[in-house]
């Protein structure tokens, strides 16, 4: 599913590589999701089912905001875009 998430990000205009050739956002967000899964000791399916809970947990008022805001809020942003991706997967809306 993370490969599909990466493809979704690329389709939405996120870059795979930066100008200097290093991996960019389309690689980073799936990586951040995998780090959250490992840190929480949950499966991707569990994260998907409880995405709102984890958005709140890693969000500005959540217990794990110090992690959520790391690297220009990459963990929190990855969760936000993962939720949008899941909505597209579920309902087929390209405008999610």
Sequence positions of predicted segments:
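Short terminal alpha-helical segments
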Residues: 1-23
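Non-catalytic DNA-binding core/recognition domains of DNA-processing enzymes
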Residues: 18-92
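Short intrinsically disordered terminal tails
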Residues: 94-96
């Amino acid at each position: 599913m993370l490969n599909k998430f990466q493809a979704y990000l690329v389709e939405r205009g996120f870059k795979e590589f930066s100008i200097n050739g290093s991996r960019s956002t389309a690689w980073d967000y799936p990586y951040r999701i995998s780090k959250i899964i490992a840190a929480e000791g949950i499966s991707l399916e569990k994260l998907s089912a409880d995405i709102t809970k984890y958005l709140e947990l890693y969000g500005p008022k959540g217990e794990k905001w110090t992690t959520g805001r790391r690297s220009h809020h990459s963990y929190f942003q990855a969760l936000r875009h993962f939720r949008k991706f899941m909505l597209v997967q579920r309902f087929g809306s390209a405008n999610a």
